[in-house]
Amino acid sequence: TLVKDIITGIFIQFENGMNTGDLVTIGPLTGTVERMSIRSVGVRQDTGAYHIIPWSSITTFANFVRGIGSVVANYDVDRHEDLDKANQALKDAVAEVMAQEEIRGLIIGEPSFTGVVGLSNTAFTLRVTFTTLPLKQWTVRFALDTQVKRHFDLAGVRAPVQTYQVL
């Protein structure tokens, strides 16, 4: 196992798959790489838990620092709401997010409005997507959710109400 740890570790490090400070998911664990040695990687979760993971036990991993971030935002709207009114409220919210300089600087390109991506007995779902700088998808999403809530409220666009049928 020691030889396998070393060989796997060399390949991952040679391929520059992760570096100290990167946010990664390895198996069920997501955290920040704090240490890399010839035999293992140390990952700290946001709960504070520190995990030492032997290189040989890593079959796949995701690195959130490489390349780009992505926001896929779905918003459920009461099925009886006017689709055009809901779409306009979403577009107004996105325009306000894009007008915020500190947020706009985190976004690559323009947002993409997909439109209706889901339909149920109680709701339809609208989607907008953004490409962001690495690790900035959450900042963009928080700003977007705040503006969507605000603009949906201003336009009177309601979320679906859960109903229960008692038999």
What are these regions (language model features)?
Residues 2-13:
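Membrane-spanning helices that line or support transport/gating and their immediate boundary helices
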Residues 4, 87-91, 141, 145:
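Hydrophobic face of alpha-helices
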Residues 5, 71-72, 126:
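Positions in alpha-helical segments
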Residues 11-105:
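Soluble accessory domains appended to multi-pass membrane transport proteins
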Residues 81, 101-167:
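Solvent-exposed, non-transmembrane regulatory segments of membrane-associated proteins
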